[in-house]
């Protein structure tokens, strides 16, 4: 299974909204990748900027997979990749 960039953003929005007790629409996410830091996300909630590392992103995807697809997946089953856009491959 493959999650699109939009689904990764949705996963992070839902995850951070639950953690910060705001609506998912109040969360802005920008996905990033560079050779030095790997996969990261810039999250803005109520004017405050927070950076998520890959482990945080994987946690959000794990929770998203369970809540949206009723599938329990673990971090070693999720592989993030990027070309023109970022995606996540979910392996069984």
Question: What are these model-derived regions, one by one?
Answer:
Residues 1-92:
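Protein-protein interaction and targeting regions used for scaffolding, dimerization, and localization
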